[in-house]
Amino acid sequence: MSFVVTVPEAVAAAAGDLAAIGSTLREATAAAAGPTTGLAAAAADDVSIAVSQLFGRYGQEFQTVSNQLAAFHTEFVRTLNRGAAAYLNTESANGGQLFGQIEAGQRAVSAAAAAAPGGAYGQLVANTATNLESLYGAWSANPFPFLRQIIANQQVYWQQIAAALANAVQNFPALVANLPAAIDAAVQQFLAFNAAYYIQQIISSQIGFAQLFATTVGQGVTSVIAGWPNLAAELQLAFQQLLVGDYNAAVANLGKAMTNLLVTGFDTSDVTIGTMGTTISVTAKPKLLGPLGDLFTIMTIPAQEAQYFTNLMPPSILRDMSQNFTNVLTTLSNPNIQAVASFDIATTAGTLSTFFGVPLVLTYATLGAPFASLNAIATSAETIEQALLAGNYLGAVGALIDAPAHALDGFLNSATVLDTPILVPTGLPSPLPPTVGITLHLPFDGILVPPHPVTATISFPGAPVPIPGFPTTVTVFGTPFMGMAPLLINYIPQQLALAIKPAA
């Protein structure tokens, strides 16, 4: 989806207009060269000579500044012309890969900022205002959903209490008549209550949770230790790229190094495959492997504890409230991933929906702003370095001036994409593909980035016969990704409201 439309003809026309303006300015400057640098002394006295020299120096400085402005103007016009040509070439080339587009866009923005120092600050203000407006619009359409659902639930509980009281008043004589029998039944039920059994069950469940915690912590520590050599090697590669000036690649490898340490792979054993004609349907529930997956497993223990004690309660309003509390814990700690894909091999048409639990989306949002800001700093550093190597010192100064704005814009409004490959075995006989490859292009978003879908590249690695049209990049439906602000203000409260909403 394209959010910006650029007309190369308009850019070229603007460059022509600026060139004409530049010619006029140069003519005016040349005409003023004599009068501003060749002032004659009014008299032969010392004061007149000093005044004449003073104005002469100012005239020379005026000519120097005029020459600098002319050089800046020429460079700006040249940049506009190059930009128009670049847009024409880009449109005719029909785009590229998503990360390449983002990286190229960042470089283009930095190059434009080098030609017009300070422009990045205006872009920062515009992007921030747009995202804040989007954030407020989404919130105002559904303000405080979790709080409103809590209030709605209390109203339901009071209605149930009122109905129970009305029933008791209406049937009061019968209740009084049956009171001795009810008391006797309650006493018998209390005497028959097997407290030892439930105590044993509670102790066993707590031991099980403790064992799960200890085992998971051990697995996480083991995974970190095992992945440390690879982390060191990848960090060394990133450092070498930093030394040679490939700053964006260094940042990308830094992100991959940390990702590979925390996520060592996916358990794709939970897969359901279906075929109908030339259409293949795949439902996969991959599980994260590695320290991050172990951390998510530990996070689910409180929700399991709450569900266990909720199940011990008899049907009542108190149990409903306990179940709602359990649902909140489950929503906040559920790390599940579910991918549903459908592909028609004959037409190469298909859909892909991926649903992520709140912990995973929250993890990406937490890391998103620092990583996007770091990537913006790397882009500015490359722009400065390239300008210096080309002898474009004015461009280098402009990029240096705009670097803080780019860094803050990345922290607030930008996104940096890292690829996450998932290989799902199909178990299908030949000549059908044995594996479906799903490479998710997951974004690290700035704090204010509004919800947006992600994309993925679908391929069939190891297929006996190449499948026309693959690999292909598709838009992924399902859980959107976003920055921390819309996640905390809108998305998570909406998910919690759904978690405690009574079933229809």
UniProtKB/Swiss-Prot annotation:
Keyword Secreted belongs to the record: yes
Residue ranges annotated for the PE domain, each copy included: 4-94
An example Gene Ontology CC term for this record: extracellular region
GO terms (BP aspect): symbiont-mediated suppression of host phagosome maturation
Pfam family membership, one: PE
The keyword Secreted is assigned to this record: yes
Gene3D superfamilies named in the record: HP0062-like domain
Keywords of the record: Cell wall, Secreted, Virulence
Subcellular location: Secreted, Cell wall
InterPro entries: PE-PGRS_N
Biotechnology and industry use: Exhibits vaccine potential. Immunogenicity is demonstrated in BALB/c mice. Interaction with TLR2 induces activation of human dendritic cells (DCs). Immunization with this protein induces a significant number of CD8+ T cells and a strong Th1-type response, with high gamma interferon (IFN-gamma) and low interleukin-4 responses, and activation of the bactericidal activity of macrophages. Identified T-cell epitopes may contribute to immunity against tuberculosis if included in a vaccine.
Function of the protein: Supports mycobacterial virulence via inhibition of phagosome maturation and host inducible nitric oxide synthase (iNOS) expression. May promote the survival within macrophages by disturbing the cytokines profiles and blocking the endoplasmic reticulum (ER) stress-mediated apoptosis. May also affect bacterial cell wall composition. Expression in Mycobacterium smegmatis, a nonpathogenic species naturally deficient in PE_PGRS genes, results in enhanced resistance to various in vitro stresses. It also leads to phagosome maturation arrest and increased survival in macrophages.
Family affiliation: Belongs to the mycobacterial PE family. PGRS subfamily.
Oligomer status and interactors: Interacts with host Toll-like receptor 2 (TLR2).
Protein name per its UniProtKB record: PE-PGRS family protein PE_PGRS62
Gene this chain is encoded by: PE_PGRS62
